[in-house]
Amino acid sequence: MTAMRTRESLAAAELLDRAGVPGDGVLFLHSAFRRLGAVGFRAEAFIEGLIDYMRHGTLAMPTMTWRVVTPANPWFDELETASHVGIVAELFRRHYATHRSLHPTHSVAAYGRRAAELTATHHQGDTPCALTSPYGRAREMDTHVLLLGIGLERCTAIHHAEEMVAPEVYLFPPEAAETYQCRARDGSVHPMRLRRHLRLNRDFPQFAAPLTARGLMRHGELAGTPWQAVSQRDLLGEIFAALERNPRAIIAPPGAPVIP
């Protein structure tokens, strides 16, 4: 896809260049578009600009469904189950992504060179962000994370580190696994058992300061909307080290504000 030269496509290209995102790599975008929409940015045109910049690589967006796919409603449909993480991710899922991982709570939509590889095995794990998930598969790729209008509190990749280092702290035990059915776009149905994340007050934003101090995280603004960007390798390296020192390092201290 080649985007028309629009305000949004030019802004997307400038943003990704300033964020240090390689056009032939993998980009995970987490976004809140409200401020950009308020100043006239069109979400569809912005997505097309992102896709054009990443035309030799892969664009991925989390398409969470944990609020609606539950033990009381245990069906996930790759094409039909709507996400609840904002307009950009939902438009991308519906109109641009060629692949979506099969997962009842933490699916990922993707477009580009490695979209199939990134999303192929999510349903083979028994946790939301296992090695078989896009977050785990992305560790083998040149992956960057961009947080637009939000901060690390919305960065799903951090859950991957939790699951790898201290699953007993952050996940329900194996005996509490739930049963779900995932329908792929070809109509095939894949049953899976899932251990959900425990509801804990996590302090993901604490990792921004050390990453920034070491020159590993970039910051900026796009039309008044703040952004942060970091390579997934650097991000997970910081968090793996923290969890290996203290498996409860991510949990906010008593009395800390609750991050919704």
PLM region spans:
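Short amphipathic alpha-helix with an adjacent loop that forms part of the alpha/beta core around
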Residues: 14-20
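Gly/Ser/Thr-rich active-site loops/lids in small-molecule metabolic enzymes
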Residues: 165-192
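Internal, conserved structured core segments that host functional sites
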Residues: 70-159
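Short, solvent-exposed amphipathic alpha-helical segments in soluble enzyme
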Residues: 44-46, 161-166
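N-terminal basic/disordered segments at the start of proteins
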Residues: 6-14
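Histidine-centered active-site/metal-ligand motif
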Residues: 30, 159-160
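Acidic/aromatic/glycine-rich contiguous surface patches that form carbohydrate-binding/processing clefts
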Residues: 191-260
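N-terminal active-site beta-alpha-beta segment that forms phosphate/nucleotide-binding
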Residues: 20-72
